[in-house]
Amino acid sequence: MSKAFREAFPTLKLEEELEGLLDTTEVTKISANHEHTHIRIYLRAKRLIFKKNIWKLEKAITEQIFQNRAIQVKIIESYELSEQYTPKSLIEVYKDSILDELNAYSVLEYNLLRTADMEFPEEDRLILTMDETIIAKTRTDEIIEFLEKVICERCGMNLKIFPQYRKPQESKYRKNSEEQIGRAHV
C-alpha cells in the first residue's frame, strides 16, 4: 500500500529543492529490524533524486522523526523514469551520483569507475574500459554488479555491461622512480 511521501511524513521539514523532488515520490514500504534500530524506507519516484539528496533526506528523517533515539534510517529508492531515458542518457545525467554512492562504499572501486571509459555501441550495451591492472581485474565484477544494481534494478532499465582493458598510461611518478632506480644501479 503506497502513500505519497508527504502523507507518510507530514511533519518533516525539508529544503525547498528537496521538497520539490519529492512531489511525485511515493513511500511503498517501511520496515524495521527486530530491535527497531534500523529502519528502511522504500521510495518510488518518477524523477531522479541524486544520492546526496537521498542522504540529506535520511538525515532529516533521523533528526526530526527519530530524534534522541539510536535509529539508523536507510532509504531504498527506485524509479519509474520516462521513456526519454536510455541507459546512456541516464549515465550522463546520473554519473556523479553513481560515483558519490560508489565512493561511500569503496574508494578503490570509485577511482576505477571514475577513470573508466564508457561506450554504448548499442542502446542496451555498455563497454566499460578500465586500465589493465591487477586491482581493476579483481574489482571489475563488483563494479559491474554495482552498475547493474543502479541502472537495472533501481531504474528499471535493461543493460548488459562488458568489461575490457586498456594499457595503462605511464604516470610521471612511476617513470621518475624507475629512472632514479636505474641511476642508483649505475
Regions found by a protein language model. Name each.
Residues 1-183:
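Intrinsically disordered, low-complexity basic tails and flexible linkers associated
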